[in-house]
Amino acid sequence: MNTLEEVDESTHIFNALMSLMRKFLFRVLCVGPIPTNISFIMDGNRRFAKKHNLIGLDAGHRAGFISVKYILQYCKEIGVPYVTLHAFGMDNFKRGPEEVKCVMDLMLEKVELAIDQAVSGNMNGVRIIFAGDLDSLNEHFRAATKKLMELTEENRDLIVVVCVAYSTSLEIVHAVRKSCVRKCTNGDDLVLLELSDVEECMYTSIVPVPDLVIRTGGGDRLSNFMTWQTSRSLLHRTEALWPELGLWHLVWAILKFQRMQDYLTKKKKLD
């Protein structure tokens, strides 16, 4: 057996052991309540690139996409049915035009890769939904996101909402306008506009409100991300930058959610 074959066998054994360890860990974790929807504010890609002297405007974001892959895998194995990702907010468009183009090109690259995987049946039961002001994005990107959503719409193992060109402020304006148009179209009285009418027209109305919001990079803000929907959610912050987020960070956040369950339940009842 040559050296390369030995390395391949060792890697295979290591991966198998890690998989068994995760299954055992997740089985223990599932004794307690599991969040229905976990939202991630993925902060720290640029700082990660600077910290590790990575070259290229998209270097940190490429590292961040690796974390997305693993975090989604862990959530699926745990049994979390919904995940919401703050991928690119409206405020991010205020960055330099070169960086914005670089990041959007990278996102398009990953969307097209996911399309290829969906066509070949390798999405592992994951459904992708894009939410935000998609009309503000270029036609090529919109067409790609639409195709990926169509290809994965029957998948149910894990539903992932990717928020692009998104902010809560924009979402509320959109929802109020859409609900008013609905009322007028149906001949209803606008005075009778209900809270539920607005919430039904939110970009993210297709999924439950988040139970747990995880923010990386040490920040305490929600950054205009789902502030309407997270009034009863647990916010967990971690100093880890997004590309550094791993299995144990996720497990610790869920354990914190489980410890706070009584408080969160009482808060929901009071509201």
Swiss-Prot record:
Kind of enzyme, top EC level? transferase
| Nucleus listed as a keyword | no
Q: Which SUPFAM superfamilies match?
A: Undecaprenyl diphosphate synthase
Q: In which pathway does it act?
A: Protein modification; protein glycosylation
Topology term for the membrane: Single-pass membrane protein
Q: For this UniProt entry, which segments traverse the membrane? A: 24-41
Question: What PROSITE patterns does its record include?
Answer: UPP_SYNTHASE
Q: Single Gene Ontology BP term? A: protein glycosylation
Q: Does the keyword Ribonucleoprotein apply?
A: no
Any GO molecular function? transferase activity, transferring alkyl or aryl (other than methyl) groups
Gene3D superfamilies noted in UniProt: Decaprenyl diphosphate synthase-like
The GO cellular component terms are: endoplasmic reticulum membrane
Where is it predominantly found? Answer: endoplasmic reticulum
E.C. designation(s): 2.5.1.-
Keywords associated with the record: Endoplasmic reticulum, Membrane, Transferase, Transmembrane, Transmembrane helix
Swiss-Prot/TrEMBL cofactor(s): Mg(2+)
Subcellular localization is given as: Endoplasmic reticulum membrane
Entry-linked PANTHER family? DEHYDRODOLICHYL DIPHOSPHATE SYNTHASE 7-RELATED (PTHR10291:SF42), DEHYDRODOLICHYL DIPHOSPHATE SYNTHASE FAMILY MEMBER (PTHR10291)
The protein's role, per its UniProt record:
Catalyzes cis-prenyl chain elongation to produce the polyprenyl backbone of dolichol, a glycosyl carrier-lipid required for the biosynthesis of several classes of glycoprotein.
Which protein family is named in the record? Answer: Belongs to the UPP synthase family.
- Name of the protein this chain belongs to: Dehydrodolichyl diphosphate synthase 7
State the species of origin: Arabidopsis thaliana
